[in-house]
Amino acid sequence: MRKDIIFMGLVLALGGLCLATAVHGAQSGPGRVYLVLWFDTEDYVLPQTNDVAKRLATFLTQQGVRATFRVVGEKARMLERENRRDVIEALDRHEIGFHSNLHSQQPTIDMYEEPLNWEAGVEEYNRREGPGFEDVRRIFGQFPTNYCQPGATWAPQSYGALDQWGVKVYLCNGRDIGLDGKPFWYGRLLNIYNVPETGALRPNIDDSPESVNKPDTDWTNLEKVKANFREIYLRMSSQPEGGVVSFMFHPYEFITKVDWDIINFPHGANPPRSEWKLPPLRNPEVSARAFHFFENFITYTKSFPNVEYVTPSQVLMLFADVAQQHSFSSQEISRIAAGVEPEVSFQAYDDYALSASEVLALLNKFAVQTLRGRGSDPITLDGTPYGPDARSAALDHTVEIPWNQFSRTAQDVEGFLEANRRVPGVVWFGSQGVSPESYLVALAGVVKALQAKGAPPDPAVVGPAYLATAKYAVQDSRAWRWEISPDHVQRPDLIDIAKLQTWTLKPAKLRGGR
C-alpha cells in the first residue's frame, strides 16, 4: 500500500499543477461550477446490477464525463468471481472510491465503533475494513481516492484509518458533521459532506418494502431536478469563486424497487448468505424512465457554460490547504493569537484557514521557540493534530500559574504534540490539570505578551473556555437511524468523539474558481 500512496501523491501533485495552470490562465468571468458525480456501487446480491453499473459508466465515458464509482469490497470480489472484466474495465475509466468492506452486514461500522475510543476505533476499522480497501485497489488496479460510509453508519474513528491509508477526501452525504452546508476539513480529510445540493438533485424514489404494493411513480421528477440544478448553478456562478455541486446515484436503484440490503439485513438482522433474497425488479418501463432521467439530466448539466465535471482527486487540488507547510511569520502568529477567544474555534482568513488544533500547534511552537531564543524564526505547519481522545472537566474559575510552571508545561505540551499528533485531553500545570481549551486561551495571552512586551506574564491567567466548534457535530443519535440498524439505536460515545474531533474542523476554500 505504501507504493500506492506515494504514487497517488505524485498523481495529485501533477493534477494540481494542471489545474493551477488552467485556473491562472483563465480570463475573468462568472464563477466556475464544478460537478462531482458519484455512484455507491454496493449491491453484491443481484447480478443484474453489474450491467447497470457498466451501462452508466459507458454512457458517461461517451459523454466525456469522468465520475466516481465508489465500490464495496464484497462487490469488487463479486465482479472478480464472476469474471466480469468488462464491468471492471468500464468502471476503471472513472475514478474509484471505497464504500466499506461488507456494507450492511452486521455489525455495521457505527455499531462496532460505538464502544471504542479513538485509538481502538481506528485499529478496529483497519482490521474490519482494510481487507475490502485492498481488494478494491487490487481488482481495479487503481488507488481508491475517496470514501463514503454505508447509509447511517458514520463513525469519526474511520477518519484516522483513512488518513493512514492515504485517502484524503470524504465525499458523502449525511447529518453527522457539517459546516454551514459548504465543504470543510475535518479529521485531516477534505469533506464534501452535509451539503444541501446533493438531496436537491436526487430522483424521487420510494424504496420502502411497502412500495412494491403501490403504483411505481419513481423517477418522475426530472423537470423539478433540472429546475433545482438551474437555481444552484445561477447562485454559484454568480460568485467569483464559483462552487462545487455533489450528486449521486446507486446503480441498483435503476432496476430494483426495494434496496438490496433492506430486504436482507433489516433492523439488525444478519442472515447467512444461503438465505439472502433477491430484491424485486422494477417494471421495464420504469427502468427505462430511470435511464432516461439520468441521461437527460447529465446532458442538461453539460449545456451550461462554465460547468466542469471533476473527480475527488481534482477536488482535493481545487480546495488545496495552503496552510499546510506554510511558514508563518511573527506578524501572522500575532494575528492568530489575537483571534483566540474563550469560545475556541477555527480561524478563517482570505488566504488560509486554521483549525483550533492547528492554532494550538502554532502558538505552542512559537512559545517554545521563544523560550529557546528563536522567537523570530518562522514556524511551519506540518499536519493537523487530531482532537483529544477524551473530554476533561472544564474550569469554572480562573487560576494563576507562575511563569516558571507555564513555561515547563508549554514544553511538555510540545513533546506531547510531537509524539502523539493530537491535542492532549488534559494539560498539566504540575498537579493542576486544565482543559486544552483553557490552556489555548491562556497560551494566546502569553504569546501576545511575549510579542508586545518581550516578556511573559507572571503569573499567567488560565480561565474558563469551551470548544465552540462542537456545535457543528452531530448532537443526538437520530443521525444513525436507518432501516438496517436495530430499533432505538443510541450512539452517545460516537457523538462525544465526533465533537472532540472538531478541534480539526475548518472551512475549505475553493481556489479553482474564475
What are the language-model segments listed below?
Residues 28-92, 244-248, 252-254, 262, ...:
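Active-site beta->alpha N-cap acidic-glycine motif
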Residues 146-262:
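Active-site-adjacent pocket scaffolds in enzyme catalytic domains
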Residues 1-9:
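Bacterial N-terminal signal peptides that target proteins for export
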Residues 66-155, 178-181, 199-201, 244-251, ...:
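Metal-dependent polysaccharide deacetylase catalytic core of the NodB/CE4 family, i.e.
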Residues 38-48, 70-75, 114-125, 143-150, ...:
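The substrate-binding groove and active-site-proximal loops of carbohydrate-active enzymes
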Residues 20-26:
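Boundary at the C-terminal end of the N-terminal hydrophobic targeting segment
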Residues 8-18:
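Bacterial N-terminal signal peptides
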Residues 169-182, 226-335:
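C-terminal domain-boundary segment and adjacent tail
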